[in-house]
């Protein structure tokens, strides 16, 4: 029998929506997954990222705050930085980007490689292309105190 609330079916469905870039539809499924498996934090990252990609920056920020309390990784810091930047919080963005570089043991080029992959998403989020190198310079400057 077909069980629409079966977790594995939900996961397969949401992956299809992600591949098709149907982020709003994917969000609905991630919220459902989060509800069905409320002891897990697995849905938080995709909810935060899909929220960012759909312009729901406050919602993304709320999920990144939750993620920060649950063993954040480099990508979490990077994406939280993007979210803060989209919300015009430059200081907050820099702080998260700095943590992302620190998580990579100070390897700025590794950070920049990951960052560069997200530039198209940043532009869609309203970040001016001319601001990107300025942010990188500001980040490099702020890191010179540490590394």
Protein language model features and the residues they cover:
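TPR/TPR-like (Sel1-like) alpha-helical repeat modules
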Residues: 69-72, 82-108, 134-141
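Conserved structural position within tetratricopeptide repeats
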Residues: 1, 31-35, 65-69, 99-102
